[in-house]
């Protein structure tokens, strides 16, 4: 075996990962080399990247254009049995158990696929704080997958690489599939599986890059809260005075838009931790949606798409131009790029002090929630566990009716511990830092229109500059929320949602309907004492 060194780091031995007769190891290659490798003329199928007019390479991830949660499994053993939030008949989630025998079969499949090949190895970090980060090693035979990992994880210095020992290994065998899946009781021939005792992730059958990124996020979500460190699916930014704000929200709530603020530096856009030193990014890059992207609407993301960025599943015309509006393959078109492709970021390390503002974003299509309300610690836990948003979905008769979404901790798909653990740790961190929490509705009200981005930005500004603390408040029944009666630069007539209806009884009827949905959803968290104690902090029906 030869090791092509692109650093001064020591030679690495892959036999300890079960790999044999490896022809060559290309470790932490430069972006220049990755560009040459992923665009080679002799590559075929999903391995080959196409150069676009913006300079970024575009790849096709095949039939998987998103994560495959039905194919996600975790080895149930002495390490995981007690703490893992396992799926059950009562509460379904993505943490499905497999035994060691099935794991061994899948590991043999992947190691056989990768053995005897020329391999790319990317060593990097998940977590900007050296005390709590995971040292990640990703092994793949596909150049663009190595590129994706180099973009998304934190890139080590040459000195760090010289003594690098992985805490967690990801072996990506995208080209192999499992023909024994039925007899093993699995969902399909494709798999994304984790063994926390061996600290290894195996991938087979899916080429989607996000399986590697979100796989490690799920692991951080397991290890950190057990050390009383918050692990969060959120964006974070920092003001000129060093004040830190974190934004939770599901897709479509404005998380990216509102945390990208010319007055504030970005810490990160998706995954963060909060420990004794403050808030820190898990990642060294961004993984942004590109559907309907335009330079005018989102200049930061558009300008980040240049050489070293990696596009997934976008339509590239024969002249190299990109049709960002084309969602025919998937609406989940993406681009990964290193964080430094964004100008206004926290440097040199993506971390800040303790957060003093925590913002839950919800796009309420029911027209019930106020545009902003300040939460008590118990309400903070309740709404964090609820993770509510709603969308307007057209029916066959052209009527639009709201569809609610509840996602625990605004990221249920990535949780590996019971959701109440994340709420408990978050509020503990907030109380120690004196942080305040706010529920911000970026959705609709009784006028039938969406709350304007100008009003929402005014609300966010009032939260961040503290002026909301000086506002007089009033009580909103059913949901038991305290709302300000006026804020600078915000239309006062929208702050009490009842005032946006011709008849306040309309609001009350809708509020009771939504409250019932909240109550029914929260019932699944009352299987422990912490969850039961929070019921009183949610909406109440007589």
Curated annotation (Swiss-Prot):
Its cofactor is Mn(2+). One of its GO terms (cellular component) is cytosol. It comes from the Bacteria. It is an enzyme of class 4 (lyase). Pfam families: PEPCK_ATP. Binds 1 Mn(2+) ion per subunit. ATP binds at residues 214, 233, 249-257, 298, 334, 450-451, 456. Its EC number is 4.1.1.49. Substrate binds at residues 67, 208, 214, 334. Pathway: Carbohydrate biosynthesis; gluconeogenesis. GO terms for biological process: gluconeogenesis. It catalyses: oxaloacetate + ATP = phosphoenolpyruvate + ADP + CO2. It is found in: Cytoplasm. Mn(2+) binds at residues 214, 233, 270. Keywords: ATP-binding, Cytoplasm, Decarboxylase, Gluconeogenesis, Lyase, Manganese, Metal-binding, Nucleotide-binding. PANTHER family: PHOSPHOENOLPYRUVATE CARBOXYKINASE (ATP), PHOSPHOENOLPYRUVATE CARBOXYKINASE ATP. Involved in the gluconeogenesis. Catalyzes the conversion of oxaloacetate (OAA) to phosphoenolpyruvate (PEP) through direct phosphoryl transfer between the nucleoside triphosphate and OAA. This is Phosphoenolpyruvate carboxykinase (ATP). It comes from Vibrio campbellii (strain ATCC BAA-1116).
């Amino acid at each position: 075996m030869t090791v092509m060194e692109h650093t001064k780091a020591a030679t690495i031995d892959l036999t300890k990962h079960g790999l044999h007769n490896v022809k060559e190891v290309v470790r932490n290659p430069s972006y220049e080399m990755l560009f040459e490798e992923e665009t080679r003329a002799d590559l075929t199928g999903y391995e080959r990247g196409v150069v676009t007019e913006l300079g970024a390479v575009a790849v096709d991830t095949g039939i998987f254009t998103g994560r495959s949660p039905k194919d996600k499994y975790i080895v149930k053993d002495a390490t995981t049995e007690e703490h893992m939030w396992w799926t059950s008949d009562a509460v379904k989630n993505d943490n499905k158990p497999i035994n060691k025998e099935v794991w061994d079969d899948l590991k043999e499949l992947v190691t056989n696929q990768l053995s005897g090949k020329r391999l790319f190895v990317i060593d990097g970090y998940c977590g900007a704080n050296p005390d709590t980060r995971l040292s990640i090693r990703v092994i793949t035979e596909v150049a663009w997958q190595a590129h994706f990992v180099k973009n998304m994880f934190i890139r080590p210095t040459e000195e760090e690489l010289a003594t690098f020992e992985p805490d967690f290994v990801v072996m990506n065998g995208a080209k192999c599939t499992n023909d024994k899946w039925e007899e093993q009781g699995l969902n399909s021939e494709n798999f994304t599986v984790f063994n926390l005792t061996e600290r290894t992730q195996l991938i087979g059958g899916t080429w989607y890059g996000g399986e590697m990124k979100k796989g490690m996020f799920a692991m951080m979500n397991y290890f950190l809260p057990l050390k009383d460190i918050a692990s969060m699916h959120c964006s974070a930014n920092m003001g000129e005075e060093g004040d830190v704000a974190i934004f939770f929200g599901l897709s479509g709530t404005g998380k990216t838009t509102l945390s990208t603020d010319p007055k504030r530096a970005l810490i990160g856009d998706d995954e963060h931790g909060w420990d004794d030193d403050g808030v820190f990014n898990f990642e060294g890059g961004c993984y942004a949606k590109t559907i309907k992207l335009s330079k005018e609407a989102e200049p930061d993301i558009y300008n980040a798409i240049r050489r070293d960025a990696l596009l997934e599943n976008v339509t590239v015309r024969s002249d190299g131009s990109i049709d960002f509006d084309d969602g025919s393959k998937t609406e989940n078109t993406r681009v990964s790029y290193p964080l430094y492709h964004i100008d206004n970021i926290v440097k040199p390390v993506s971390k800040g002090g303790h957060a003093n503002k925590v913002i839950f974003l919800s796009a309420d299509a029911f027209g019930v929630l106020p545009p902003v309300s300040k939460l008590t610690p118990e309400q903070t836990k309740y709404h964090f566990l609820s993770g509510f948003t709603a969308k307007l979905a057209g029916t066959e008769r052209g009527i639009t009716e709201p569809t609610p979404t509840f996602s625990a901790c605004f990221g249920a798909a990535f949780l590996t511990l019971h959701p109440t653990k994340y709420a408990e740790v978050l509020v503990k961190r907030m109380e120690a830092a004196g942080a305040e929490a706010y529920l911000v509705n970026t959705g609709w009200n009784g006028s039938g229109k969406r709350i304007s981005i100008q009003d929402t930005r005014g609300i966010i500004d009032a939260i961040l500059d503290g002026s909301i603390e000086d506002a007089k408040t009033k009580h909103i029944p059913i949901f038991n929320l305290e709302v300000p009666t006026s804020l600078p630069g915000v239309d006062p007539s929208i702050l009490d949602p009842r005032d946006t209806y011709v008849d306040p009884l309309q609001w009350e009827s809708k509020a009771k309907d939504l409250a019932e949905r909240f109550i029914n959803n929260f019932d699944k968290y009352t299987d422990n004492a912490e969850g039961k104690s929070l019921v009183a902090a949610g909406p109440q029906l007589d």
